[in-house]
């Protein structure tokens, strides 16, 4: 890929600013963990795996900022850093997975000089980034086998390199199929209200010369009814033990339409997105974002001032609508409670 979503460079976190795409390709440099937290909250970086990487790097930055004379003081302040990161966005489980992994790394180094702990946390964050890229490649490899020659694939939101450390989950499947020489094309839902499909997915696919057609969200059923969609591939922000999947708002609607038209609906996500502590999706927290994301586009009002707005950022697709869940360790195909538990144990 010709861009980097996030990286650690010269003791700073460098992120492509996704609020500026596709008009401007701007990279932001962060040396303060609070600024990284605000970047996550403000969607400078977004997508569950990328949020996890950003949170890990934010914790590593925070550890470098801590001034402490004792281990107790250091770990007390580090807990505060982790709490700040955890409060940024509630739905993406990768955020909490990455923070917990950083906590465990710090605890494993307890008793060593503080500089050793700081270095260990930086190395762990960089390792999480590298692992995520490898994971996405494996997801792509497993998923590409499900994509037939000549397929037209509908995707929703952006689950590509911009949503991960690189390559992507849903777009990783698409990229892998393209790299395998399959003739494919993509239909990208625009994904209101934040327009990740219009702004980000099309930008990524065009950079990779993968044929892509942009459609508005309310056109999906039309193209399915005409037989123009072969399959759907989306990412995920949290998957419950039974396969219920939280993803960008509008995913549920696409899944229902796909089921009605007999079109396979695939979810592509790393095992770190599984939340086996939840029996089903009913307890997945759903983030509500500011009303201005609905009433304004690029700062311009499109609705009457003072109108009541609801803006849930995610919805939950029941497992019965999902044909298969593609992970880095293999594909779960319907008996999700058993199969996802087995994949998580690999």
From Swiss-Prot:
Report if keyword tRNA processing is assigned.
Answer: no
Q: Which residues bind substrate?
A: 46-48, 89, 196, 247-248
User: Which residues does this entry assign to the site Transition state stabilizer?
Assistant: 157
What UniProt keywords are attached to this protein's entry? Amino-acid biosynthesis, Isomerase, Methionine biosynthesis
Per its record, the protein catalyses:
5-(methylsulfanyl)-alpha-D-ribose 1-phosphate = 5-(methylsulfanyl)-D-ribulose 1-phosphate
Kindly list the biological process annotations in GO that this record carries.
Answer: L-methionine salvage from methylthioadenosine
The enzyme's E.C. designation: 5.3.1.23
What are the positions of the active site? Answer: 237 (proton donor)
Pfam families in the record, alphabetically?
A: IF-2B
Give any GO molecular function from the UniProt entry.
S-methyl-5-thioribose-1-phosphate isomerase activity
Q: Which family does it belong to?
A: Belongs to the eIF-2B alpha/beta/delta subunits family. MtnA subfamily.
Instruction: Cite the PANTHER family for this sequence.
Output: METHYLTHIORIBOSE-1-PHOSPHATE ISOMERASE
Biological role: Catalyzes the interconversion of methylthioribose-1-phosphate (MTR-1-P) into methylthioribulose-1-phosphate (MTRu-1-P).
Instruction: Give the protein name, as stated in the record.
Output: Methylthioribose-1-phosphate isomerase
Q: Which organism is it from?
A: Trichlorobacter lovleyi (strain ATCC BAA-1151 / DSM 17278 / SZ) (Geobacter lovleyi)
Species lineage: Bacteria, Pseudomonadati, Thermodesulfobacteriota, Desulfuromonadia, Geobacterales
Q: Which gene encodes it?
A: mtnA
